[in-house]
Amino acid sequence: MAQALLVPPGPESFRLFTRESLAAIEKRAAEEKAKKPKKEQDNDDENKPKPNSDLEAGKNLPFIYGDIPPEMVSEPLEDLDPYYINKKTFIVMNKGKAIFRFSATSALYILTPLNPVRKIAIKILVHSLFSMLIMCTILTNCVFMTLSNPPDWTKNVEYTFTGIYTFESLIKILARGFCLEDFTFLRDPWNWLDFSVIVMAYVTEFVSLGNVSALRTFRVLRALKTISVIPGLKTIVGALIQSVKKLSDVMILTVFCLSVFALIGLQLFMGNLRNKCLQWPPSDSAFETNTTSYFNGTMDSNGTFVNVTMSTFNWKDYIGDDSHFYVLDGQKDPLLCGNGSDAGQCPEGYICVKAGRNPNYGYTSFDTFSWAFLSLFRLMTQDYWENLYQLTLRAAGKTYMIFFVLVIFLGSFYLVNLILAVVAMAYEEQNQATLEEAEQKEAEFQQMLEQLKKQQEEAQAVAAASAASRDFSGIGGLGELLESSSEASKLSSKSAKEWRNRRKKRRQREHLEGNNKGERDSFPKSESEDSVKRSSFLFSMDGNRLTSDKKFCSPHQSLLSIRGSLFSPRRNSKTSIFSFRGRAKDVGSENDFADDEHSTFEDSESRRDSLFVPHRHGERRNSNVSQASMSSRMVPGLPANGKMHSTVDCNGVVSLVGGPSALTSPTGQLPPEGTTTETEVRKRRLSSYQISMEMLEDSSGRQRAVSIASILTNTMEELEESRQKCPPCWYRFANVFLIWDCCDAWLKVKHLVNLIVMDPFVDLAITICIVLNTLFMAMEHYPMTEQFSSVLTVGNLVFTGIFTAEMVLKIIAMDPYYYFQEGWNIFDGIIVSLSLMELGLSNVEGLSVLRSFRLLRVFKLAKSWPTLNMLIKIIGNSVGALGNLTLVLAIIVFIFAVVGMQLFGKSYKECVCKINDDCTLPRWHMNDFFHSFLIVFRVLCGEWIETMWDCMEVAGQTMCLIVFMLVMVIGNLVVLNLFLALLLSSFSSDNLAATDDDNEMNNLQIAVGRMQKGIDYVKNKMRECFQKAFFRKPKVIEIHEGNKIDSCMSNNTGIEISKELNYLRDGNGTTSGVGTGSSVEKYVIDENDYMSFINNPSLTVTVPIAVGESDFENLNTEEFSSESELEESKEKLNATSSSEGSTVDVVLPREGEQAETEPEEDLKPEACFTEGCIKKFPFCQVSTEEGKGKIWWNLRKTCYSIVEHNWFETFIVFMILLSSGALAFEDIYIEQRKTIKTMLEYADKVFTYIFILEMLLKWVAYGFQTYFTNAWCWLDFLIVDVSLVSLVANALGYSELGAIKSLRTLRALRPLRALSRFEGMRVVVNALVGAIPSIMNVLLVCLIFWLIFSIMGVNLFAGKFYHCVNMTTGNMFDISDVNNLSDCQALGKQARWKNVKVNFDNVGAGYLALLQVATFKGWMDIMYAAVDSRDVKLQPVYEENLYMYLYFVIFIIFGSFFTLNLFIGVIIDNFNQQKKKFGGQDIFMTEEQKKYYNAMKKLGSKKPQKPIPRPANKFQGMVFDFVTRQVFDISIMILICLNMVTMMVETDDQGKYMTLVLSRINLVFIVLFTGEFVLKLVSLRHYYFTIGWNIFDFVVVILSIVGMFLAEMIEKYFVSPTLFRVIRLARIGRILRLIKGAKGIRTLLFALMMSLPALFNIGLLLFLVMFIYAIFGMSNFAYVKKEAGIDDMFNFETFGNSMICLFQITTSAGWDGLLAPILNSAPPDCDPDTIHPGSSVKGDCGNPSVGIFFFVSYIIISFLVVVNMYIAVILENFSVATEESAEPLSEDDFEMFYEVWEKFDPDATQFIEFSKLSDFAAALDPPLLIAKPNKVQLIAMDLPMVSGDRIHCLDILFAFTKRVLGESGEMDALRIQMEDRFMASNPSKVSYEPITTTLKRKQEEVSAAIIQRNFRCYLLKQRLKNISSNYNKEAIKGRIDLPIKQDMIIDKLNGNSTPEKTDGSSSTTSPPSYDSVTKPDKEKFEKDKPEKESKGKEVRENQK
């Protein structure tokens, strides 16, 4: 590859394409064709050379090719890619060096490549302006498409657009040709789009087709053309299409699961949602007289009356009239009801009747399969599902909650997250591919450098021979060198014109130089910029190193990490193609950084953090050198006159940083230390070129050397110039005006200011100011007093002043030039300027929004808060990566918005009365572009169903369904999941660990550290004085030789920093060191000394955890009180593994936990008290040897054995469950059930006593120390305390006290005690506890992030949500009646000035509002209020403030998409961390070992089973053969599927005939399945019931038969019997193994199976949380007013109802509705005096604070944490499952092996005869299959044999496995392990002693054969002698030709005795396997024969 690239660089590589070129190509092609025979041409596809990826059409020319000569721009050139050397193509390049490839055949049969017309077309096509023009046209066209009612003149504009598009296509067709050859117009799929758009335009124009607007919508596709024009978008769309392809399996699985659930729904709820409450007809109507006939089933299916006595009452009309149904206020649909006991009941005077249409315009139902499927899809995407849930439960009964639980957990969580998992994996693969490509390119580049180096060496050798040398001194010489190089090779990286300019400049300069030489020496500053640039480039031509002492204009980047890519058009792409590894040593550098190990470019994602952080700098991408490193951290030895010193930023990139006068010239050229004159500099510079001058004499050598130099020079130059973003004049300007160093006095001032401003304490002060300022801003609220608001104003002024002062001082200290080099400073500057601007404009109306900019100050916290920094970085990274994706998303949204507007806009206008009673457009419509956009955005947020109903009602079902489903699937499921995948990928642990920006500790920590140090110092001094005063000899622990110190962890954030800054900085910006508990001593680890970590196992390395998370705590600050404790802590510390760059803090195990985890050797209780106690109170220590002490000790031992006994634990668990269950009975009916109440009271006392007893026993048994150091014991202790307190209070009669009552609610925590007792839940909880620090961190960051939006909301909407409502109707007054507050008050009692419940009146309320918006629940009301708001004290007007929607859109994107998904990221990340910590075995395995290990794991778990013997009876045998065939299985599956289809056809309102037909068909199926059952029973006999699936079939068949006869009865008492048919679908799972194509789906199901145990644990935990919250809810919200989401079925009155509500909120659905009534705190919203019959409670008001806390905490716990754990498990297992399926051997392969084995070993002896082995190997499926002829391979496997020539199954399997996986050293160890496991799982395994092996046996056989043959030969010779003497006599007579005869005899003899005949019989002895029955033995024998002979030969040769 590299050769191919390197051969032609230089101008000669570009050759114009001429007729000769074409002829040459044709000639080459013909030659090649002649060379290759036809066959080979077909076969060669695999090994064909591939086109060079760098020279693909559309890419830019790699700049190794240099410039295109101007005369060749836009001209046809010969193809550069060797791949096309004999293809008819040519290339054209435009000025931007983009490559266009064309076919060299005639376009449209007439235009040859050299035809002038075609040439002009090509010139136009490749010109950059052409694509610009098209792009502008498309954008303008898009703008015109958004007009809903375009004016008439737009018609002409349309024609213009069509004209331009036609012109574009014509040009393309003329230039490229139409469609026959490669690279023609229609060969590019994007052009199909153009073509169809143009054709459509003309068709709609000239042919009048009915619905033109539908066709006009196709114009929207023009927006897609932007994709084809913008290069980056094509790749993203590629990725999207890839992920959609990958989604096919998930889609199939999803559709299948949804169909199954839809069928179940269809059977369960068909027709239920039409049950309504009908008013009893008036008593005098004819209805009363025949009531009975209505309810005795005389209604036919249409609800009309069947022959009843002639009456005037028309039942059909009566139920058809909607006014007779019971409708709740504010609802569109009538109230549903059900006839079950637990279904919804009707009010008095109403009956429950099935009539009318379904809810929501009739679209929500389970009446037909299609509607049921839609309902299920809606459940899966969880959109407004609470509505469906409530309707269904109300109509069918609460028990059906189980159906929803299943669908939500298995359907929704699992399937939706599978989609996410697949998209994420597709993205990950795409990413890997690009990374690999980049690495490959880098390797290629390295290769090229090597080649250049070789060429250079050769050149030098040539040059050395030549004697003459030319004096080469002075810059002029250099100029000439460079000049000649440019002439010799136009390999420059800039265009020729630039070269000319440069040359001109250089000549002028040389001219000047001659005159101004003296001046130049004395004034180095004025050196012309260009020459410096020329000369500053020192590079040694060594492939890996490039030394430069060049200072760049930006301190963050430097030459050493060249971020441009050699061959890719993206200059700033993340993965640079090559990186120069640099070593730079500089005058003032503190350290000599030599880092050749890591390339500076390596992507942070691509490498895990190394354990030895201090050793590496090459970790994160590009980061800023902090300003502190610029000035305050100068090395003490440096004078302040600004000599350079270098800092190494995190990439190992050396940036030269210096004081104010560091820049000695505009580009920062620095003369090396000690050089006085320029000549020296020049000499040094030239010497480093390393190109010997002699060689320049030899012209060819000179040319070559120069071209080498110029290649590199130009590469560098281009780089450097790309770095210098501005023209040189700006640098001169900057030098004069932006760098202030005029006089010494000023420099002193500057130095002083510098010292002050850069001090860490100032940073701390500023941070505190930021926090205070944020608090001040957050204190705004409505209504505010004058005084308060003036305080806030003054505060704002003060803070603005402080920040302005900070900025001014920093500018003085650092110079504007340097100040603005750093991101944070620019950010500060912008904020300060905005604040000042806002002060000036504060009185201007409408500019109050500027105040919101102050909020950005909050982000300054990120500087010192790593997690916030990380979040901003992640958002930054993602936004970078998401740039293109966002564009794609925007295009998709745009297209759908326009499509919606074009298709449905008119319908909304015309049919609006169908969806709105007052015939005005609803808020969500598609009549104009903005509203259309909002609807599409809402669909992306996952809310599609409600807007779709409206659409279907006004514009017809099919179109709406198609459009909405497309938006949903493409936009929401694919693109948004890609978003999430990107987020998760930028969330790799590296980003988490490497939070700090540079290798500096941030100033805050230094400041806090200093304070800590001061405090410690004071403490120590005081302690010393104290000790001197009171004790003579202080007790000091002697620490010997530091060996005990070794293992103690260092203070986590490394605060001890000496003044000389000699601490070590590691990659995380924290100091790594090892020290004692709180001693000041630090072990500074030398970088080169890191090996000691490895060699000294007692040394624990703490890899610091992201700073800031550790809260600067010292990990073990407790003073060690004794040697033993020190030892103990040492052991503990060694046991804990510090997290590796994780977000998990290291938690030291406490003593109690240790007691739990370590197996006890002997049953001895631990010490009662801690050693500290015993020291202070010596009487606590009792001798256990005699007297009372001994009795006490024995008592403790007894207690210990009781407590440790299993039964005790079981009993306690039982008690916990009972006591928790008892809590569930305390609902609102407890007062009426007196007996239960008294029982519960007694039970409560009993439980309390039992728990107290348990606690006392544990105290005695474990001792206080153990008990109180265990977290679970503390939990028990606190819960028992609560019970105890309430018990005592009851006894004293204080039970009615408020405090005691609230304490009683804490009893709800009792179930928590079950946590520690259930292993599964404990695991989950431990994982959660581990994640708490990082979850908290993310929560905090989210709060900060949201704070900004909340304050902004307060600024925008505080007090503006108030409105005036009519008290009687509850409706809002129109603005014509009431305009403001005073108008409303004037109306008196009938009106009320009321606020929206969830509002933005203060920051707290704002948070709640934002949470509702972020979870998309209740957000509509908030948005409507915001959009309608006008101003404080003014009545709102409909959509007055329309663009406020954008505030919410922006918040949803940042606040919801980003921050909420961060939770998933953090939890997944934590999961991986935890797994690394605990499941350590995987980490220490190589990939190879893992493969073997996994294969063995699967292998060990299987063993050969006895197959079901074939019956002896002939008839049974035939049936057996029929039944055990695969075909039989598959046909049964097809029947099952057909059965499903017939079930799908059922509908609620089908006719009688249809019902009859379906029942007959069902009968047929039952007969068929019964037939299957009978056949299997006959053939398999009693073995039938040994297989699980068969039992399943049997049960289903029996149920179906029973169901047929007893259908009515079963339906009455149980569920509909048709459900059993659905269950049959489970059998499809069996068939998946047989279908090769279903591997993907199998993987998905396998992932689900793997996840189940974990999901079960998480489910348990969720249930526990729900249980606790349900009890809490019952005790607090049982009596609230029934409104919004709380009604007679969904409430907190009973335990069941609470659980139903909480399950609904688990997915955050409808929590706003449940919260609304609880927010009613005073009249007139609720009545505090309502009487509740049967209970003593008064009033129905809620408690807002408790309610908000209850719901918000529940949502955070369940929706954000537990449900995300569920997601994390699925993602994790999906990736594991995909890995497994990618492994060479899967479970199925082993299963298949054993299945085939059963046929060859019917008695399960575990042995097989050697003779059968060949057939066995051939009968397997790949990959284990060894096809015939396979004897040689099998013998070569050297399998051990036992007596009787038998081989054990394990040996065979092992050998075959080895063959698949390849040889490996680890096999033997694994083999032994595996045999042990096999023996363990198979006690029946015969222990056998192999007596020989196949290879040995064969050798023996062959040896025998050779002996035999030789002996025969001997016999033969003897006989020949005899025969020949007889023959000789005859020969003389008959002249027989003797030699022929002799041959014949020998043949004859040979034929009689084939030595290997015995072998041939092998195949006949095998049992009737599938193969052996089908092939006649003879054929097999023939096949094996030649093989045997060849084998014999081989072996013979070997033996020789």
Curated annotation (Swiss-Prot):
It comes from Homo sapiens. It is found in: Cell membrane; Basal cell membrane. PROSITE patterns: IQ. IV repeats lie at residues 1508-1806. II repeats lie at residues 742-1014. The gene is SCN3A. GO terms for biological process: behavioral response to pain; cardiac muscle cell action potential involved in contraction; membrane depolarization during action potential; sodium ion transmembrane transport; sodium ion transport. It catalyses: Na(+)(in) = Na(+)(out). Belongs to the sodium channel (TC 1.A.1.10) family. Nav1.3/SCN3A subfamily. Residues 370-386, 930-945, 1403-1419, 1700-1712 dip into the membrane without crossing it. Disulfide bonds join C913-C919, C951-C960, C1364-C1384. This is Sodium channel protein type 3 subunit alpha. InterPro entries: Ion_trans_dom, Na_channel_asu, Na_chnl_inactivation_gate, Na_trans_assoc_dom, Na_trans_cytopl, VGCC_Ca_Na, Volt_channel_dom_sf.
